[in-house]
Amino acid sequence: MRNAVGLDISKLTFDASAMVGNAEYSAKFDNDSKGLNQFSDRLKSLGCQNLHICMEATGNYYEEVADYFAQYYSVYVVNPLKISKYAESRFKRTKTDKQDAKLIAQYCRSAKESELVKRQKPTDEQYRLLRMTAAYAQIKSECAAMKNRHHAAKDEEAAKAY
């Protein structure tokens, strides 16, 4: 069984749950350079050579954390739907960030090697393309919503507003 760390990352903080051997650890860190350094020190204190860090691809808050630790460890960024399906299969409904981090660590620990794809830090050009693609998707979604509101408008004055 692999040694795993699950991270639940938000804008300001991230929760970490580590499963090393038979021991479990959990902690919360600020999502900034100081927090990354504190978390890095905590990982080093575990004395584990072969550590796998897993997190969900939610928003863009995970990117800096993933890229930083991919330099030193095996880092996996997982589709949130996979974690959700994993939770359903284990009849778990998490309510807190700490529980989410533990669930992600459990997934990382039990997933088949073929289900985990190592994080490779994107180039600046790839980041730019990702941002443009996300912006395009957002604009497309907003246009569709605007068309739906216009179509649903009951009177002529309301239709003019859209």
Residue ranges and their predicted role:
Residues 1-162:
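Phosphate- and other anionic-substrate recognition elements at nucleic-acid/protein interfaces
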